[in-house]
Each structure stands twice: as structure tokens, then as C-alpha cells.
Amino acid sequence: MDKDVQEITDSKQQLTEAAFSNHTPMMQQYLRIKAEHPETLVFYRMGDFYELFFEDAEKAARLLDLTLTQRGASAGTPIKMAGVPHHAVEQYLAKLVKFGESAAICEQIGDPATSKGPVERKVVRVVTPGTLTDAALLSDKSDVFLLALCVGHNKRGVASTIGLAWLNLASGALRLAEIAPDQLGAALERIRPAEILAADGAIEAVPAGTGAITRVPAWHFDIASGTQRLCDQLEVASLDGFGAQALTSANGAAGALLIYAAATQGQQLRHVRSLKVENESEYIGLDPSTRRNLELTETLRGTESPTLYSLLDTCCTAMGSRLLRHWLHHPPRASVAAQARHQAIGALLDAPVHVGLDSLRSALRQIADVERITGRLALLSARPRDLSSLRDTFAALPALRERVAEIAPNAAALGRLEAALEPPPGCLDLLTRAIAPEPAAMVRDGGVIARGYDAELDELRDISENCGQFLIDLETRERARTGIPNLRVEYNKVHGFYIEVTRGQTDKVPDDYRRRQTLKNAERYITPELKTFEDKALSAQERALARERALYDSVLQALLPHIEGCQRVASGLAELDLLAAFAERARTLDWVAPEFIDEIGIEIDQGRHPVVEAQVEQFIANDCALNSDRKLLLITGPNMGGKSTFMRQTALIALMAYVGSYVPAKAARFGPIDRIFTRIGAADDLAGGRSTFMVEMTEAAAILNDATPQSLVLMDEIGRGTSTFDGLALAWAIARHLLSHNRCYTLFATHYFELTQLPAEFPQAANVHLSAVEHGHGIVFLHAVEEGPANQSYGLQVAQLAGVPAPVIRAARKHLAHLEQQSAAQATPQLDLFAAQPIVDEQECNQPPAAAPHPALERLLALDPDDLKPRDALDLLYELRALARSGATDAQR
């Protein structure tokens, strides 16, 4: 904080007049405002610029690459300054928000012409990372959440529950949840708040890197006050109708959140009209590891594409894209919602051409972002082009509703959406009459209110716009009336409007002419008519802008009662757009509607990984069958063979089915699924002081503790990072526990071939492998899942493909042969990594390997053409081509 601010504030931000005595009046005003926002950058309006002073200026100059200047002094201290043009402030605010900073926008609210001393100023809004509503500060396709966190304690003073309340201020969507303390990390990973509000005692509970943290006084989280504040906000006597009356810490969090959000906007939150209480049992559980490993909305490298979201997002509106992101992270457990969505997709695909999918999507492309426009409307910050876009959208809704109405009889969900697309009564008429067809970007620029809406404004505009013509007409009339042929009617900024007559013609001047200025060769006059026009003309533009501002404000006020209706339309448009996008993906990518069954089971016929399939020329489809008699698949095969792809595609297809999308398969059937777990990949946690193996075991522990018979578990290469015997023992024990205790659907990929003996002990386990064909010392991956275990991992061949030098590969091959001989002699599973091994002579390693027959030739010799079906023959051609290419590559080496 600036030392000047510190001088004038105590710990409770109480100001003392003595602290201001040595400062100029303007700096006194600034310092008082800054004292109210000590942790926030204050943008102080001065004419056409926003200025920042002292340490704020230094910080802004560093973050925004501004020029830091020093002008004058106050109280003997040089005033450091940095500024940005007022018309470009949004782009600078956007940069600050990305840095996690907040900014208080301090505007001039007084009239400079009438002010004595500094013009009156006040902070009209505070821009923080979690309270963004302006289009320039928001990403079109993702939401920004402000979250408040309240820790509840039991009688012993131990944290027993955490209440969460999070708000999307741009749309007004408010949600509450109460969770156990150990679930906080997963909840924050799912919500991904941009800003977290917490009292001092609760900040320690927030995991690092989960959003900007803002300290809020503890009394803001009072549960009783929060409950009452929620009732006041929603205009209800009780929260029973929302299922929130019995909540405690969540209501306390909501109270703090509403206080903070309203304070940043400087007004009430009119668009926060409902809330939703989220329960863990409502959605399929996805922990942070699963969301990351399945690459739902972000790749493992941190990019937005290629992901499931980027593949599915062909939405025509930003609202649909944001809803897609929400659906992917909130798949409902109950299949009813998904079945309704599947039915709607089918109806869209089967619709007649004139009202079909392409026609519907073409109409949706003309739709504006009604959701965010409504949010700005409720906060009275909507701009003219927001209202014109809202008008044009409402005008397009009748035709859109007609298209949906023709399809709706075949899908109940579409019937519900058709009803939601009716504009609030009177809104379209008001917007059509009041807003110009193509308004200016800002009200201050004029040209926003339509002609014919207000007679006074039309007159002021006519005066301002027709000034030149009036002067020409007056000059013509006065020449005729006075008989002075060279009489001129003109204007200058010093004397205003005047009639100029040369010295030789002054005797013809009428009596109603009043002398305004005497020149050497002429006299300048004013008449009552010209004076009246001058009074109107000189103030017409200013008065027109003021009148337009007042009319615009009245239009905003007139639209406020229709906020809920606009939100209903926005919700309907978003869902319709997303269902249409799902239908387009199903048609384009040849996806099918999945089925839901009551029995335990996952059956996927010819399933494909949706994202990988879009990236490769040819994708090999595979089946997956899990049921009460087949609960665990032990997956073996070479690295690069497709084990992880097969596992991920199974989880993604299941997730897509419950989200409500069609799926990439020939057919798919799913029983109940309550959670999806993944233990895939290797990564350490340096910040948390955890090794790769520790991270792996932590994730495995969570699965073993929480998985149920309705959970889908993906386990990939469990047991790495320690000695062979330790890893094998852990993998064996974990697989047994999943079978005997959790009894969940499990895909268990491993290179421990000893585990393939597990089905002998547990009939619910089965072996499958990813096929590959070995050619000499090379390998061709076929990516086909086949029954039974693999016979080896082909690790050396994969290393060769990766570019490991040939001498190293040959040395490894010699050493492998020795290990295999030793293993056979000792009849042990696999040797401990830390056991001493004999060294192979390096000269032997440099000897070239013996030539091997071409793999394509071997494959051809082994097949029986009479047994081939047409589809098998086609698959064989692709296989032979792959073998031929591999052989050519090996020959080049």
C-alpha cells in the first residue's frame, strides 16, 4: 500500500483529516478513494484518461507496459503517474484480470462546469477476476465463476463440512453445495473458479493454484444472515423450494458471495433469481485425475485441442458452447435425462429437409448471446448493440419456433424448448421502436435511439443536423427582405451566429437587427429569429445526447421486469443449439444412439476413440464387454499398441452416452454408472513433494476406497516406479481387491504377464491383448483387441522405433536373452531391478542381426483366402499395407 494511504488509514480503514492537510484537493480526493480500495488498482478518471498514481502507477506500468511519468508533487512527494485512454480501458482491464488483479473504476459524476474544486468522483464498479460481465473481458465459450468458501466445524472445533457457493455473474446462475473437507480439491477442479472468497481461517484449506483468493471478513459468512440474504435475493420466505433451507455453511458462503458481488457492481443483482443445490449423487463422479486423463476440455499438455470438447463443439452460439462444457463435466447418473436428449437428437436427424438440422442450425447462427446480454441488462451495463442484438434475436424467434414445433411431437425435450423460445411480451416491440437499426457502440456517441421514438429528441437532432440548411434559407429570405444582395449569415465559435452587412449597405438594415460586432468594412448583426435558433443550435447536440442518455436509461429500466423471461429464452436457445450440434456430430461422424439397461454391464460393439479417430487416417474399432460375469479385463500387449487408447475410449463412450450424445460405435449398451476413475500416465508432484510412484499409489488408494460395483475403473501400468517384485505384488493385490471387494467394472492394463494367471483364480477376470506382428527385430501394431494374453511386450522393438541407437538395441537384445535363460533356470517370475546382472560383451552387440523374411510375405503365406469374408479381406488389405510400410522402413534402416 502507498505510504500516503497508510498515513490516512488505520487497521479499520478509518480516515483522519489531519492526514490530508499537506495534499492538494485533488490528491485528497484520490487518497480517500484509494483508502477504501487499498488492495485494488484505482483507475481515476481525468478527462479522456484514467490515471493511476503512486504504487498503483508503478504496478500498472509494469504489468500493462505503460509509460511511468512523474508530474508535480503532493505533500512534498513526487506524484508518479500512468494512464490509459478511457475508450481503450477494457483491453487493459482484460490484461489485469489475467494477472489476477482487480481494478476500481472511479468516474467523474459531477459537472466540471459547475464544480468548485475537484470534480466529484466515485467508484462505480470494481472489476475482479470472478466478477466479469463485459464482453471484452470474457471468453465467449467458457464461464467465469466467483466462489465463496465457508468451513463448518463440529462440536470439537474440527472442520467437518465445507460450504460452497458459486456464481456466474454474467448469467446469474447461482449454485450451492456442501462437501466433506477432503472433497474440496475435486470440487474446485470441477468448478474452476476464477476468484475464491474466504475468511482468514479458511484460506489455508484452499489448494494452491486454484484461483485468485480474496480475503473477506469472517462475519460475512454468518449462516443465519446468509440464509436471510438468500431469501431476500430470491424474494421468498423460505429456501425449502430450492432444497437449501437445511444447508448451513453453504448458506453462509452464499451470503458472503452476494455481499461481495453486489459491492463490485455497485448495485443489486437483479438477474440472480434462482439457485440450484448440487448433490454428489446427482452426477457421475469424475475426480481431477479422470477429468485430466480423459482430456475432456483440456489436453494433458494444457491446450484446448484436440479434446472431446473441441470435437463436439460445432455449436452455432456461444451459449451452446458454454453449456457443452458444463454438460461434459456434469454427466447425470440417471439415464432419464440422457434418453430424452437422445430422443431429441433422433428427431432432429429424422426431420424433413425444410425444417431439418441444416435449416435449424442456419437459423441458430443468427442468434446473439442472449444469456450474457441479459446479465448486462440486469446490471444496467448493457450497451446499445447489446439491445439491437437482443431485438434481432427476438425477431428471429417466431420462425425458429415454427421449425422446432414441427419436430417437437417426436421428442418431449424439443416440445419443452419450443415453449421456452417465446420472447417476453412487449420486449420486441419496445426494442424495435426505441433502438436504431444500427446503433452506435456507445450511448455517448449518439445515434442510439431510433427516430420517431421521442419527438423532443427528433427536434433536437433536426436542429443539429439541419443547421446549415437553415442558415442558407435565412440568408435567402433576409436578402430578399432587405434588398442587400451581399448579405451573409455565418457562424464562428467566438460570436456565434450573425448576419454580416458591408459598410455601404448598413442604411438598409431593418429595425429588428441588433448590432453584435463592428468590423473595419462591415457590421455584424443578430435578429430575434437568429438568436432563438442560436440558443437551440448551440445546445442542440449536447441536449440531444443528454436526452438520448435519459431515454436509453428508461429503456433499460423498462426491460428489467423481463429479465427472467430473457433468461428462459437464453436457456432454451443454448440447449437447442447443443442438441443440434450433437445431431450434426452424429450424422457427420457416423455415431449411434446408445441404449441403457438396468443390469450391471457395459457392451460396446466396434467402439472407436472419438478424438483419436478424427486425427488418424484409419482407426481400428474394438469391442468391449463387461458384465456381472466379466468384471475385469486384463489388457496386455506392446507399448504403443493401443492399450491406453482402448481404455480411454471405453470411458469416453460411456461418458458421452450419459451426457446425452450419440456415441462412436456400431452399438452400445450401458448399465448404471456412478463414478469413473482413471489411473493412467506418470507424473510427479514436485510442488507437493510427491514422487511419481507416490502420486500413482495415492490415486490407486482413492480408487480402492471409493469404487463401487457401479464404478468404471481404468488402471494403466500400476506398480511402476519401484522394484519389479514390489510392483508385481502391488498390481496383483490391487487387481484382486478390485475383483473381490469393489467388484467394479475394471480395465487393467499391465506389462506384468504373471497377472494373466489371475482369471484362473477369479472367473470374473478375463485376458485380452492388443495384437501386433513381429518382423525380424521390428514390429507392426495392429491395434486390434483380441481374447487371451499377449506373449510379450515388444519393448525393444518400440525402443527401436523411438530412435534408440542400434548398438544399444543390440546390447539390450543380448542381455534380454540372457535374462530369459536365467529366469527359466530359476523358475522365477521377473528379476528384481536391483539384482546384479552379467554384462554382455560390447563387441558381440555390434554384430549385425540376421536378415528376416518380409512380414507381408509371412502374413500372406499364413492366410487361407477361402475363409475370408469381404470385410475380413478389406481389413487384411490395410494390415498388409501397414506391414509393407513397416518392412520398407526397416530396410531403409
From Swiss-Prot:
Recorded GO CC terms: cytosol
InterPro entries: DNA_mismatch_repair_MutS, DNA_mismatch_repair_MutS-lik_N, DNA_mismatch_repair_MutS/MSH, DNA_mismatch_repair_MutS_C, DNA_mismatch_repair_MutS_clamp, DNA_mismatch_repair_MutS_core, DNA_mismatch_repair_MutS_N, DNA_mismatch_repair_MutS_sf
Keyword Membrane: no
Pfam families with a match to the protein in the record: MutS_I, MutS_II, MutS_III, MutS_IV, MutS_V
Family: Belongs to the DNA mismatch repair MutS family.
UniProt entry tagged with the keyword Transferase: no
Gene Ontology MF terms in the entry: ATP binding; ATP-dependent DNA damage sensor activity; damaged DNA binding; mismatched DNA binding
NCBIfam families: mutS1, PRK05399.1
Protein purpose: This protein is involved in the repair of mismatches in DNA. It is possible that it carries out the mismatch recognition step. This protein has a weak ATPase activity.
Protein name as annotated: DNA mismatch repair protein MutS
Gene label: mutS
UniProt-annotated binding residues for ATP: G637, P638, N639, M640, G641, G642, K643, S644
GO BP of this protein: mismatch repair
Keyword annotations from UniProtKB, A to Z: ATP-binding, DNA damage, DNA repair, DNA-binding, Nucleotide-binding
